[in-house]
């Protein structure tokens, strides 16, 4: 199938042609896709011949519905695009934190050692996510390691979700506390070393994080 024909199928889905018929005109579709009405008609006929849509002509326009075969194609396309976009890679920009990372890493250090297998440097590297939209998009296919909460000196420390990562060859983890003040655009990274010093990072530097 040609890319333009596939784009037409996607456009029909966006217009609501899944689960029921919609009425369209060649003029509005051709304007959306920046092609002639004749080309739009030819693409509709191709989709119909391939079994991806059903269509009927009337005085009001063309009634179109995406078939089950067409829906399966769109679902497969969505899965492939999701894998391509959210393959566990985060591209971000180094930023300064609010200064609390060192304290909390020290409190959780014994549990980080137990559950992640390394002694963490007392501090976090904060990364503002550029791609994908949020850290959750990059982590959606990964299973977290749950570091359980605990009480210490009358204070309660909540659970932490940890995701193993590698940044410029150094293994570490993205940590997401159950009680976080950071928005989903900020990734907190811990590692056995001072990442800023080891990788010579400054605020504004771009980094690439691979989720393991």
Swiss-Prot record:
Q: Which source organism does the UniProt entry give? A: Pyrococcus horikoshii (strain ATCC 700860 / DSM 12428 / JCM 9974 / NBRC 100139 / OT-3)
Q: Paste the cofactor note.
A: Binds 1 Mg(2+) ion per subunit.
Q: Annotated pathway, please?
A: Cofactor biosynthesis; FMN biosynthesis; FMN from riboflavin (CTP route): step 1/1
What protein is this chain from? Riboflavin kinase
Q: Which family does it belong to?
A: Belongs to the archaeal riboflavin kinase family.
**Per UniProt, where does Mg(2+) bind?**
124, 126
> What is any one GO biological process for this UniProt entry?
riboflavin biosynthetic process
**The protein's enzyme class:** transferase
